[in-house]
Amino acid sequence: MASKRLGFVVVLALVCQHINAFPTPAGPDDKYNRELTEEKPLEQQIAEADSIRKTESKPTPPAEEETNSEDDDITFLKALAEKSKESNNETPISDSANERLGADDTDSTKNRRLADDYDSTKNGMDYKYQDDPESFRQLDGTPLTAQDIVQKIANKIYEEDDRGVFDRIVSKLLKLGLITDSQAETLEYEVAEALQDLITKNAKDNMIGDRSVDYPVSAAKDTQDEEDRPSPRFDEEDEVENEGGDDANGDEPQEEESRDDTVRSDDSWDAVSDGNDRNELNPEDGLQDLQFFPNFYRLLKSLDSEQDKEERETLITIMKTLIDFVKMMVKYGTITPEEGVTYLENLDAMIALQTKNKLGKSLVPLSITPPTGKAADDDDNTKTEAAKMQKEYESLKDSTKDVQTAAEISHPGKSESYLEAIRKNIEWLKKHNKEGNKEDYDLSKLRDFMDQQVDSYIDKGILEKDEGDVIKRIYGSL
């Protein structure tokens, strides 16, 4: 019995020794083996494969550092090449631009400029003024200064002939918050000065070129009117012939003849030979601008003596100056074209009235004149008047002598007002033109002088206020 127990102990000891000599596999290994033998769902297998792939593709930190160092070397070489290229081209770049370029070069993701350098369509102007990217630019790329903006606004106002352009521009700037109210007021003064300088400059440049531009169309129109309009003299001759052939209606032809003689007497100085006077103009005498002033031209023709030579030249100079002056004022909008035409028409008409006044003629149109019955008598009367006028002017050496104007004899009106203003203008020109020429006139003194004269005429009732304002506006625009 004891031997059986001993044998059981020996067997138990051997079994325990065998277990210690051959250890069993660890738990995780046994679990892995079981995972290999078990069949997993397809979705789980795909997810495990993806996780393993991501784990294997992840770069190690040493490799990342090596890549960054290579990128920095390439960026540095590119920066050196770009700087050498810019130094060869001598392109001015500000310090702030260099700082930005340096910051951009260190970033490997910012390589746009390098690509642009190889673009043949780029001329480098995009980066020339990087220090002020939001400034206004001209067409050549240069920054637009405040003076340039003022000049451009003035040019726009002058081209469109509309001062509302400035209001529209300023209102937009104010709405956008680009300028303040005080800056808008300053801008208004600067634009006004620039506009005035522009008008003055263009007036000086175009005054000579505009002397023979404004009237050719009117000349052709007036010539056509003269051809289409029957002459009063020819109508009167036809009526004389009809009167000789028809005595039965003697009373009616006599009344018509009386009216024709009245019209002829009124027009003997102003309109009978307008076309003939215009045809008599010689291009060599330099009086083409005076072709629409028949009365004045006839006056010059009468001053053909040697003694009246100086008087003739003075009158021509004054008349041409006034014509150019009116044309310039019409061109730049100081007066309307209608006012300019009225000014010139009244000027020629008042020359005739003043001449008749000097000759002792009545200023009012003749309403009752006995019929002459012959056109030849009208020619004789015209020649007689011309001869008397020549003798009268031989004794007149000063064209600015105080004479009684139409405004002092007849009722005041625009014609008399303009003539009186012109007479004062001539007096001033005579007084200030003793040693210099017409380019040496002090126009500011002339403007002040005319303002005083116009105010005195308004106070005396010679001028209406609106007429005085027109004259002031003419001289104030100089």
UniProtKB/Swiss-Prot annotation:
Compositionally biased region (Basic and acidic residues)? 28-42, 97-120
The reply to whether Protein transport figures as a keyword in the UniProt entry is no
UniProt GO BP: protein localization to secretory granule
User: Where is it located?
Assistant: Cytoplasmic vesicle, Secretory vesicle lumen; Cytoplasmic vesicle, Secretory vesicle membrane; Secreted
**Keywords, comma-separated and alphabetical:** Cleavage on pair of basic residues, Cytoplasmic vesicle, Membrane, Secreted, Signal
Enumerate the residue ranges of region (Disordered): 22-126, 208-287
Annotated signal sequence is 1-21
Q: Which GO terms describe its cellular component?
A: extracellular region; secretory granule membrane; transport vesicle membrane
InterPro entries registered for this protein in UniProt: SCG3 (IPR026197)
The keyword Zinc belongs to this UniProt entry's keyword annotation: no
Acidic residues: which segments have biased composition? 63-74, 235-259
Topology class, membrane? Peripheral membrane protein
Q: What is this protein called?
A: Secretogranin-3
Q: Which organism is it from?
A: Danio rerio
Q: What is this organism's lineage?
A: Eukaryota, Metazoa, Chordata, Craniata, Vertebrata
